[in-house]
C-alpha cells in the first residue's frame, strides 16, 4: 500500500518494517536530480534520530535518503530508501500552531505554552542537524514538519532541500507563502543559492506560531492605509504582528506577546522579522533560539 505525494509514492519494504522506499512519479529523473540524491546519501547528517524517552527507542527525525533505488532493467535512478517515520502517531505542525487546530485532538488540546516551547526547541535541534550536513531546508513549511505525541519533531520531503557537495549546489526550487524569507521573493529559485539565514526566518515564523497561536504576518489587526497588503509584502517591510509602533496590532481578544513572553525573546523576533527584513545576516541563529527557549522552559517550569 503506497502513500502518494506530490513527487512520488512511499511504499513499505517487505521484511524491513523500519524502512520505506520512495518511488518518483517521473520515470526519468534529470541528471542533476540523480546527482543530488547520490550526494545526500553520501553526506548524511551527523545525527538524524532522537531518543524517545517514553519508549527507550531512537526514532528518526529526518526522512533522509539512505540508499539509491534503480530500475532493474534500465539501471535508471527511480527513488531511494529512508527510515520509516511513524506518521500515524504524529500531526503536521500547523495542527499545533493554533488553539483552534489543537482542540481537534485530545493530546494536542492539552499542549500548554511550556510544552509548545519544548516542541520549538526540538525543532531547533532538527534544523541544526540539517545545517550540519551542509543542507538548507528551503521549503520550510507547515506540512513538511511533523510532531509526535512524545513531542518529537520530524521533517519529511528532505529530498527537496538545497544540498551542497563541495563547491556544487543543488537548489531547492520550492517555496511556501508565509514562510519564505522576503529576500527570496521574485528570485529564480532554480538559480538561487539559499543561505542559513533564510531558514532562520522560517524558523522564527514557526516559533512565533507555536508560542503565540498566530502567524506574524497573516494575523493581527491591520491599521495602515488602504487594504491590508499580502503577507510577503508585510514581511518585506518588516511589519509583523506586535511590532512596536507597527501597523499590525494585536487582536483585542488576544494577550499582547510582550506580556506573555520575556523581553529577550521579543528582541529575537524583532531581529528576525524587523531588522532582518533588510539585513538577513542579523537574524537569530538556531543556537540563539535554542538558548532562549531553554531559559524560557526553565523559567516556565519554575513558575508551574
What are these regions (language model features)?
Residues 184-197, 220:
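Conserved end of the kinase activation segment
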Residues 157-162:
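Activation of the activation-loop gatekeeper triad in protein kinase-fold domains
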Residues 271-301:
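Terminal C-lobe "cap" of eukaryotic-type protein kinase domains
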Residues 169-188:
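Conserved activation segment of eukaryotic-like protein kinases, specifically the C-terminal portion
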Residues 60-119:
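Conserved structural core of kinase catalytic domains
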Residues 196-198, 207-266:
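Conserved C-lobe activation region of Hanks-type protein kinase-like domains
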Residues 118, 127-150:
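Catalytic-loop of the protein kinase fold
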Residues 1-34, 56-61, 71-74:
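ATP-binding glycine-rich phosphate-binding loop
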Amino acid at each position: 500500500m503506497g502513500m502518494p505525494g506530490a513527487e512520488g509514492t512511499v511504499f513499505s519494504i517487505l521484511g524491513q518494517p523500519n524502512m520505506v522506499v520512495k518511488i518518483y512519479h517521473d520515470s526519468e529523473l534529470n541528471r542533476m536530480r540523480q546527482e543530488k540524491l547520490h550526494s545526500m546519501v553520501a553526506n548524511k547528517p551527523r545525527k538524524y534520530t532522537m531518543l524517545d524517552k517514553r519508549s527507550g527507542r531512537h526514532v528518526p527525525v529526518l526522512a533522509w535518503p539512505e540508499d539509491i533505488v534503480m530500475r532493474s532493467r534500465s539501471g535508471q535512478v527511480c527513488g531511494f530508501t529512508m527510515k520509516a517515520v511513524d506518521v500515524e502517531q504524529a500531526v503536521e505542525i500547523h495542527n499545533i500552531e493554533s488553539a483552534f487546530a489543537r482542540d481537534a485532538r485530545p493530546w494536542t488540546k492539552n499542549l500548554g505554552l511550556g510544552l509548545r516551547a519544548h516542541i520549538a526547541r526540538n525543532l531547533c535541534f532538527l534544523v541544526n542537524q540539517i545545517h550540519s550536513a551542509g543542507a538548507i531546508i528551503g521549503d520550510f513549511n507547515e506540512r513538511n514538519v511533523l510532531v509526535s505525541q512524545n513531542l518529537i519533531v520530524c521533517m519529511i520531503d528532505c529530498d527537496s532541500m538545497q544540498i551542497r557537495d563541495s563547491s556544487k549546489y543543488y537548489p531547492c526550487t520550492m517555496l511556501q507563502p508565509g514562510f519564505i524569507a522576503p529576500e527570496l521573493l521574485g528570485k529564480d529559485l532554480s538559480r538561487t543559492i539559499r543561505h542559513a539565514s533564510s531558514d532562520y526566518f522560517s524558523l522564527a515564523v514557526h516559533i512565533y506560531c507555536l508560542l503565540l497561536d498566530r502567524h506574524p504576518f497573516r494575523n493581527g489587526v491591520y491599521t495602515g492605509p488602504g487594504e491590508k497588503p499580502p503577507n510577503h509584502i508585510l514581511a518585506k517591510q518588516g511589519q509583523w504582528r506586535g511590532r512596536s509602533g507597527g501597523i499590525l496590532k494585536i487582536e483585542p481578544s488576544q494577550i499582547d506577546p510582550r506580556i506573555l513572553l520575556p523581553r529577550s525573546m521579543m528582541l529575537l523576533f524583532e531581529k528576525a522579522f524587523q531588522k532582518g527584513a533588510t539585513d538577513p545576516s542579523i537574524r537569530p541563529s538556531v543556537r540563539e533560539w535554542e538558548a532562549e527557549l531553554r531559559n524560557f522552559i526553565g523559567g516556565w517550569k519554575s513558575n508551574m
